[in-house]
Design a protein with these regions (language model features):
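Domain-level signal for soluble alpha/beta catalytic cores
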Residues: 1-213
């Protein structure tokens, strides 16, 4: 039987609430907790619009960029962002825009480029010979839990391994498609998919509902 679902939903909010919440956090006028609370409220509104569907997308929401989200999910964080104080969210925004709340802890932001032929710009993944991956699926697992607690059937949506490698760039003389990066990346995605399959079975969703882009 056919199931009705989509690949994602706009995340900025009907009145650009996310944009204003981001700016408030970066300027120090609001807290991390307030930003995350607003993000959760936007997700709930989005899911409410989709509640008539058989499956609702999770993982489509982002505080800045979905490709950057996948880099952090894989632990592929530029070395220049690893040695600063603050939490994961602060490092996330440093990679995205050069700095987070503390302007003294600034770095070079990641390169931005167009997502294929669209006007959407994503943060380009970086690869080096020393690049290592460390899986952290908590972001999407938390969103799956949120959707499940609302009585919805979640469908994880992520950037797939081939796409992730293809749109990234080498920052040294390494080759992103050599066996070193290729194997490590696919191992992480296999683990990620196993986690999602396990979760989706727990909420009575067929394995085929898992989608990668």
């Amino acid at each position: 039987m056919a199931k009705v679902h989509n690949l994602g939903f706009p995340r900025v909010g009907s009145m650009r609430e996310l944009k204003f919440a981001q700016e408030g956090y970066w300027s120090g006028k609001s807290t991390k907790e307030e930003l995350l609370k607003l993000a959760s409220e936007i997700r709930k509104i989005n899911w409410d619009h989709q509640k008539s569907l058989d499956l609702v997308a999770v993982g489509d929401f982002s505080l800045y960029d979905q490709v950057l989200d996948m880099s952090f999910t894989l632990g592929n964080i530029p070395q220049r962002a690893r040695n600063y104080s603050g939490d994961v969210l602060d490092n996330y925004f440093r990679v995205a825009r050069g700095r987070s709340v503390d302007p003294k802890q600034a770095i070079s932001a990641a390169e931005m480029t167009k997502w294929f032929d669209t006007n959407y710009h994503y943060m380009v993944p970086e690869f080096e010979v020393s690049t290592t991956f460390k899986l952290d699926a908590s972001r999407i697992i938390d969103q799956i839990t949120e959707a499940k607690n609302l009585g919805l059937k979640p469908k994880p949506v992520i950037i797939g391994p081939v796409t992730y490698l293809a749109i990234g760039k080498e920052k040294d003389n390494s080759n992103k498609l050599n066996q070193h990066h290729y194997t490590k990346t696919f191992i992480q995605f296999i683990l990620l998919k196993f986690i999602f399959i396990t979760i989706t079975f727990l909420v009575v969703i067929k394995v085929s509902s898992f989608v990668t882009l």
